[in-house]
UniProtKB/Swiss-Prot annotation:
Tagged with keyword Cytoplasm: yes
Lineage: superkingdom: Bacteria
Segments of this protein annotated with the region Involved in Mg(2+) ion dislocation from EF-Tu: 79-82
Gene Ontology molecular function: any one: translation elongation factor activity
Keywords for the protein's UniProt record, in alphabetical order: Cytoplasm, Elongation factor, Protein biosynthesis
InterPro entries per the UniProt record, alphabetical: EF-Ts_dimer_sf, Transl_elong_EFTs/EF1B, Transl_elong_EFTs/EF1B_dimer, Transl_elong_Ts_CS, UBA-like_sf
Cross-referenced Gene3D superfamilies: 1.10.286.20, DNA helicase RuvA subunit, C-terminal domain, Elongation factor Ts, dimerisation domain
Family statement: Belongs to the EF-Ts family.
Function: Associates with the EF-Tu.GDP complex and induces the exchange of GDP to GTP. It remains bound to the aminoacyl-tRNA.EF-Tu.GTP complex up to the GTP hydrolysis stage on the ribosome.
Protein name: Elongation factor Ts
Length: 291
């Protein structure tokens, strides 16, 4: 695969690596961006392992709870200007309410919304506002108590990040604090048992490669890897993370101290994982001039 300047720039932007290091990483991994990031980490050359490109999608995440059931829905628009539009926000709120009864995005798009489907409602709104929109994803959560939190709220119940927390015991104040923690820290899973084994194995392999670069005895390397993996899991899982409200306790310990148990969570962030290629201003003007 040809290693283009654009690929090198993307890797440099996401890792902070130097130009020659980024080019070598891509050459060694045949242009595979994720593998190149891991290669840089192994060599100690990546300043930040951001494995996704810049997120440029706009829109809102809305959260709704009814009884012990909650749902978070992401509805995308092309610009933040539309996300601030009251008509768009009203539509997102109605879509989120309908999502409580939907199992997935396809079912939600087919759901009735005031006499027409959600899909048809979106089509009509696109025609009115003049900008493309889509329901990207939804996530549901059930529990004894489900608490919501919205970060960067555009209006009640919707914003740039939406969080649901399911609990047994405790009170809403604790749930809100945990939800704010989740919004800020973005844990990968509730506990070690719920972590993606592929992610864990990949991290273990990276740490093995880093440790072996040290040239230390195998017994020492095994201890190094064990310690680093414990730290990785602790930093990645909600219940083991230091609670932002009280760093002396983990989230799990803080919940237990309050007589509560966190049983699940959902976190959706607008545009998360979407990479949108940006044209430079001159190219944008040229395209507009061509109609």
């Amino acid at each position: 695969m040809a290693i283009t300047a654009a690929l090198v720039k993307e890797l440099r932007d996401s890792t902070g690596a130097g130009m020659m290091d980024a080019k070598k990483a891509l050459t060694e991994t045949d242009g595979d961006m994720e593998a190149a990031v891991d290669w840089l980490r192994t060599k100690g050359l990546a300043k930040a392992a951001k494995k996704s490109g810049r997120t440029a999608a706009e829109g809102l995440v809305a959260v709704v709870v009814e009884g012990g059931k909650g749902v978070a829905v992401e509805v995308n628009s092309e610009t933040d200007f539309v996300a601030k539009n009251s008509d768009f926000q009203e539509m997102v709120g109605k879509i989120a309410a309908a999502a409580l009864a939907a199992d997935d995005v396809d079912a939600l798009l087919a759901a009735d919304l005031g006499g027409k489907s959600v899909a048809d409602t979106l089509t009509a709104k696109i025609a009115t506002i003049g900008e493309n929109m889509s329901v990207r994803r939804l996530a549901k959560l059930e529990g004894e108590t489900v608490v919501t939190y919205v970060h960067n709220a555009a209006t009640t119940g919707m914003g740039k990040i939406g969080v649901l927390v399911a609990m047994k015991g405790g009170d809403e104040a604790l749930g809100k604090q945990v939800a704010m923690h989740i919004a800020a820290v973005n844990p990968a899973a509730l506990s070690e048992a719920e972590m993606d084994p592929v992610v864990v194995e990949k991290e273990k392999q990276v740490q093995m490669d880093i440790a072996r670069e040290s040239g230390k005895p195998e017994a020492v390397i095994e201890k190094m890897i064990e310690g680093r993996m414990k730290k990785f899991v602790a930093e990645s899982t909600l219940l083991s993370q230091q609670f932002v409200v009280n760093p002396d306790l983990t989230v799990g310990a803080a919940a237990a101290e309050a007589g509560a148990e966190i049983t699940g969570f959902v976190r959706l962030e607008v545009g998360e994982g979407i990479v949108v290629e940006k044209e430079d201003f001159a190219a944008e003007v040229a395209k507009a001039a061509q109609g």
